């Protein structure tokens, strides 16, 4: 969204979807990869132009390094996880269930986004769409409020529905849920 705004794109932020810096991670098989400097020259896979990409760049910057100091390979999260499992990359940029699985498998956490990225996911439309379809915008906001209320009033049931839908163990869903702030409110810290 920052790039869109910088290029004068027609963007209207409606609200927030989530904030979850802890859920975005870099994982390795090699336990010695514990600092940005230890990543120099290593092959690191993950999706470009994402929060995970921002995490990698921010982490490297803490040691005055850039993405040019590593062998970065643009891959989806599932491809990155498979490449890490197969040993063809040194580090995978993972989030959500893939990060949880890597942790369970004993992969070494290099870093997560805490203190490095805000990991803000916003809900946005074009200004043109916003102005042309106020009824759809209202339905979306109403549905979001209804979902948030359901989760707040029926947390165990909501987590079980999520576990069933995603074919995950309920304990995994509970652990991941704790990493997220699903408040739709746009806070001052969300503004750039």
How does the language model describe each region?
Residues 98-99, 116, 129-130:
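Short, catalytically relevant binding-site loops at active-site mouths
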Residues 1-66, 71-74, 90-96, 108-117:
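Short, glycine-/small- and polar/acidic-enriched structural segments
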Residues 24-33, 120-136:
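A bilobed periplasmic-binding-protein/Venus flytrap-type ligand-binding module shared by bacterial periplasmic
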Residues 5, 43, 48, 60-64, ...:
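Sec/Tat-exported extracytoplasmic proteins
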Residues 132-192:
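Secondary-structure end/capping motifs
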Residues 36, 53, 57-60, 77, ...:
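Extracytoplasmic/secreted envelope proteins and their assembly/folding machinery
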Residues 19, 45, 49-53, 77, ...:
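Solvent-exposed, acidic/flexible segments
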Residues 6-8, 25-26, 104-107, 122-125, ...:
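Short secondary-structure transition/capping segments
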């Amino acid at each position: 969204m920052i790039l869109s705004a910088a290029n004068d794109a027609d963007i209207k932020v409606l609200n927030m979807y989530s904030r979850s810096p802890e859920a975005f991670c870099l994982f390795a098989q090699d336990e010695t990869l514990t600092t940005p400097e230890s990543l120099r020259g290593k092959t690191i896979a993950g999706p470009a132009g994402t929060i995970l990409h921002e995490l990698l760049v921010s982490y490297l910057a803490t040691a005055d390094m850039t993405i040019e100091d590593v062998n970065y390979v643009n891959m989806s999260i599932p491809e990155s996880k498979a490449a890490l499992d197969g040993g063809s990359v040194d580090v995978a940029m993972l989030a959500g269930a893939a990060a949880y699985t890597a942790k369970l498998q004993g992969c070494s956490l290099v870093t997560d986004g805490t203190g490095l990225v805000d990991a803000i996911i916003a809900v946005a439309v074009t200004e043109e769409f916003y102005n042309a379809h106020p009824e759809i915008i209202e339905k979306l906001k109403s549905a979001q409020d209804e979902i948030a209320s359901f989760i707040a009033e029926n947390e165990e049931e909501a987590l079980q529905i999520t576990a069933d839908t995603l074919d995950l163990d309920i304990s995994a869903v509970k652990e991941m849920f704790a990493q997220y702030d699903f408040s739709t409110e746009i806070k001052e810290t969300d503004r750039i």
